[in-house]
C-alpha cells in the first residue's frame, strides 16, 4: 500500500526508514513490503540456486542476486525496487549500491496474501 501523501518521495526517504523496514519506491511513491514467509524464502532460495548453477555450469558472465538487492530503475532515483531474484549480464549496471537500470531478468514470487 502506498503512503497517502501528495509529495514525491525520493531514495533519501527510503534510506531514512528505520532499520529492518523494507519498502520499494515506484514513481516517487513508497510501498511497504511485508516480511516474506518461510515458504517464500525456501522457494526463492531454490530458484536462486538453480539459476546460479546454470550460469556457472555454462560459464556465463551474468551475475545473480537475491533480495534484498537494490535495483534503481531510473537515474533520478524515483524508482527503487527489490526483486526476489535479479540476473544482471551487463557489469556496467553494477556498483556498490546494486544495479542501475533494469536487470536482464527478474523473478518475483507472489503469494496469495500479496494480492
What is each stretch, according to the model?
Residues 1-115:
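Gly/Pro/Ser/Thr-rich low-complexity, intrinsically disordered segments predominantly at protein N-termini
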